[in-house]
């Protein structure tokens, strides 16, 4: 009986494994898998449709084609289970064994595995130390390889052609052995002595860098072979496994034809060629024929494994390349990405969505028909439980007939059973949320309007999918974690996601505006009820200014109880009525103003922080209901008269046209260049457009009214278009400008600006030419969008892949490290406040009050809104907080270092997949970023040219440590530092603002001077860069020769002449001469730099205009020459998506700047080949030198002292340099700031945390500098956690630990170099990853999320983390228990054995076994 029950038991996969290993199979292993050899290429008999014996579908090898029935029909039914039929040789069993039983083909000649040959770098080449070209020549029978030189002068592994071989045979006879084809390669592989080779290579890790690198790689492979017990000769196949037939099916189509898997074709070819070769070898055919057949067999095997990898791909009947085994697993439609990482699921449906304004936030409307289909199993079980149906079949009938009882049951089943709604593309975790279904008529799903922004849904035909969680656990998780009312914040920024938009905003805005002299102005009411009655009676209008007695509930500082306070408040009727829905604890002041979209968002945010989740959700729903109602009552509409065209427009356009004409004249006269004219014209029209739109907004936003005293006053306008834009409901000033102002300048498809603007607007209408110009932009926009979506999706995919295994795994890693945060200030403006940067982070050290040094925040406390308000009040301007980068958790992150979970508002939970959330937060807004790289041209260049800085606040002036200046003859202070900054401190000495000042600027303030806001701090010439002397003396020119190094330029208009430094074209002089000036003192000696014996030498760059004469006396701070900035090409600024990708891929920028390698003094050496030799000498006298191309802009000069990591050559910084010279914290700051700049430009808010998490993953590998007593090879890249574990073990054993340095990898590189080969293989370059993993015999510890999804287990995150931890703990306990029992048994047996037996022996076998 038991065996019968076993039969029906479901086959359960064993989920209790902790790692997966991949390796290479030996011929023995392949034979052991096999159930028989496939000898014939036939598949099935075309008449009987039965598989041919010994063929590719043979039932004897692979199993029966009908359940429990042999092929000839002798044995049928269950009773003969396991019998092997003597007639047809088929085992009687289930037919599904045809999915798992493999066969094999014995190859008549060995064949190399193409993956190990052609997947770069060639593994065969690495092991044999031969080039790929040579191995290929041997394998494909073009050359011989010496496998055993014997006593001859030949070298092993040497290659010889046919002719050479014949000659050598004549010379040496049979002394040596040389072979062709895979046999030769196999012999070579067999002859490798791995241990010996390893020893030899370990001793050989010296010499040239190339050789060391090569040896290190070879050593790694050989050590892997040794460790995993894989023999190198297995890379050459002798036995080919055959895939089970049901995995490469043959399906009869109607009309007697068959659809077949390409693999069958490929196998057929291999079998045909193999049998032919076997026959030839038996017949002892001539060598050349056998050789040709062997080559063909090798090619057939290659095509089967990876078609098209070498030579032309094998094609089928229809000229299409056949799909080989490798193609099955790689790419988007391969096994990994199509079937393992993403699957289609049952119990799901999709339909169009419509708006459900009456729903509560946690509800959605589900069409009855859909619900009936989705909840079928639940309905069936209910019908059976009620006894209405006895079998599933009967229940099915009942449901299909649709009797009333079925609908009643559906209502019952659906109660409190959440369903999940998903809108594609699911860019972040709010793209799938759970709702409680409400049954509705019709066929469209109803969606709550407030969740639209999270789904990015609208109702113009969008569709959504519904999924039903089946198990109780799944329902529970959907309800607690995914219910829409539990996800009210965006995980990217912590801002509310349930913010009203469009009509709701308009309604609330309209109701909270105030109107001068509205009906009922000045009335006083006893309470809001009275206001409501007056409003209903038509005695008072919503916008009328009135006074009401209101009761507010607020929490005092020290208690949690709500206390009422009542007061008379001056407000409007609309606001008073709206105050009724405020949750207790939210002050009325938040609604006592015109509610625009931003204000409503703040209102919800404050409500969430002050009143909690539940109150906020109820409040949001009430806001929604009121918004819709009020918008309907307001009846705002658009008429053409609302689009007011400003009367000043004609004048502005006329003036601009005059200016453009003037410029055209100047251009014709040759006073300005074509480029200048174009820039100026674009500039003029840009200004004109702005002026028109200013005039238009001024006119739209104000209107004149009579107040109740009969005076004419102006108030904010009630113009419909203005209200829509002002409230944030729809449209913006830029859009209104196109309707009622002027459309302005348009861009060509290549991004350059057309200089003829569109002066008309949409109200006046466009003429044909204007219309044509404007189509450019529209079309470019559409093309851009399509490209952008694909690129953005790919960036998200790379980000997810690099961070997928980062999970919060412990509470606190107890590190003392952190990062110092202060507000980001640029050009004197606070771009990101300290509050935004430290909110929700953990303090890494005590935060003290700046004045009385009291502890405001102790270590390890998370900074929430209240604490930050205290810090702001105390005026703290920098805080050291813990960050994801400094966290010391080995695998994953700790909760304290991560801080607040932005999507939930509290400290992050254990098991939260912070990596994936970071990737989603950065990738989701990707589609909003621009694709274009901006040219600084036209409209953009106006903002760039600055010529002075002003103080923004009152305070005391200070200079940064890098600031250096000299006083010139007029007593002005001239800056001679390249990176000097002016800092303004308030009276407590806290930094308020910081301004960069360029080289050569004149300072208009002194240190410690008190300044008022608006004071000019420094000014400079914007369009030229000066060369300044720091010392006094008389100039002495060197190499300044007219016609050779300088040219005299005459200014036509003014008649003045200047010397311009030119590039010496005459290559006659061996050394390149460089024009320079030295200074001579009164005695005629050269002026030396104080403290050195360098003389002061100031070089002139090409393009400099020399401002002094030879022999002129100059004072410090005087300008010797000026370099026009115009001469420098304006660099393209990479913006938007490409910039973000560039940063995360850690690419070295083109034209990168150079940072100083060490702290020291700058000097210039001899020039070579158009390059300048720049040297830095440190205090110990070590010299570092760098060759800099002439056209680069060098930021330092002779004798200047630079600090390590300071910029010495202009250009964008290379992240690798920043990491090497300045360390991890600086690098992180650089990447975070640069990425944030791109997003900030688009108005997207992302928390710094997310970017830090990605930088952490980019830094997760290190490079071994010195192996110490570990098994690493220097130069090897290792996972950081692994080397830390190794070093701990080494220290514990008293050995020398390995020394390593940080390594920054781009996200693609980092994903591919992860320890998990399953994750890497499913990302990109599947073949290469799997080849490498197989050779190394890699183990995948299944730590990440992706690996676990692929092997089909719960992921180790969220609720799954607890499951896995519990499972591992239980396994460990079971192990310990087992060990204890075994020990006890052994002890018992030993005790028995100690009793002397008859022959006097006392030791038994049990002792040996116990050991």
UniProtKB/Swiss-Prot annotation:
InterPro entries: DNA-dir_RpoC_beta_prime (IPR045867), DNA-dir_RpoC_beta_prime_bact (IPR012754), RNA_pol_asu (IPR000722), RNA_pol_N (IPR006592), RNA_pol_Rpb1_1 (IPR007080), RNA_pol_Rpb1_3 (IPR007066), RNA_pol_Rpb1_3_sf (IPR042102), RNA_pol_Rpb1_4 (IPR007083). Zn(2+) 2 binds at residues 813, 887, 894, 897. GO terms for biological process: DNA-templated transcription. It catalyses: RNA(n) + a ribonucleoside 5'-triphosphate = RNA(n+1) + diphosphate. One of its GO terms (cellular component) is DNA-directed RNA polymerase complex. Residues 1391-1411 are annotated as: Disordered. Binds 1 Mg(2+) ion per subunit. Binds 2 Zn(2+) ions per subunit. Keywords: DNA-directed RNA polymerase, Magnesium, Metal-binding, Nucleotidyltransferase, Transcription, Transferase, Zinc. Its cofactor is Mg(2+); Zn(2+). One of its GO terms (molecular function) is DNA-directed RNA polymerase activity. It holds the Pfam family RNA_pol_Rpb1_3. Mg(2+) binds at residues 458, 460, 462. Zn(2+) 1 binds at residues 70, 72, 85, 88. DNA-dependent RNA polymerase catalyzes the transcription of DNA into RNA using the four ribonucleoside triphosphates as substrates. Belongs to the RNA polymerase beta' chain family. The RNAP catalytic core consists of 2 alpha, 1 beta, 1 beta' and 1 omega subunit. When a sigma factor is associated with the core the holoenzyme is formed, which can initiate transcription. This is DNA-directed RNA polymerase subunit beta'. It comes from Verminephrobacter eiseniae (strain EF01-2).
